[in-house]
Amino acid sequence: MSGSSPKSISISGVETDITIGKELAAVAQKSKALASRDCFEQLEMYLHGRSHDRVCLLFGLLQTGKNTMLRQAIGRMTKEDLSRIAYIKARRTDNMAMMNRDLKKLFNAGFRYVFIDEVTLMEDFIDSAALFSDVFATMGMKIVLSGTDSLGFWLAMDEELYDRAKSIHTTFIPYREYSRLLGIDS
């Protein structure tokens, strides 16, 4: 498959908002030319590291680069890996049972990288977040959970994801990084 464009794979019966294949590649393409946050390397290390029992939490205030980092990480994947990536936009109406069923379908279809945006919108996330690390990460999936609810992530890390998550907090942006990202001479 190397050298070919990513396939748009249809997964029937999914309950969550999943983007894969050509649509995902098109979204990721828009972020390739943007400068990366200093903490981007931590995300890359998680995605390409050997750890298979942890998830990655990417959280912080609005407009601090979380979605751009997700798209940049997806855009830097090989074409082979791109065919194994799914992006899920969590909604308030989603729950962990739905997510569990869809992640099983994705795993069985060969997906190994899953980016779940605004995961804390799900009402039962905090009480059942270990599903991501204890089941799917140990099966070999790299799962990145992102969102703006820092308290929700902190509560999940304190309970369900204790010692099972790599956290990347994007809220603090040093002036040197800010000026580099925006091309401001200081």
Residue ranges of each PLM-predicted region?
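Walker A/P-loop nucleotide-binding motif
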Residues: 52-71
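Short glycine-rich substrate-engagement loop in P-loop NTPases that contacts/grips substrate
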Residues: 82-110
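Conserved P-loop NTPase "ATPase switch" module shared by AAA+ and STAND
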Residues: 107-128
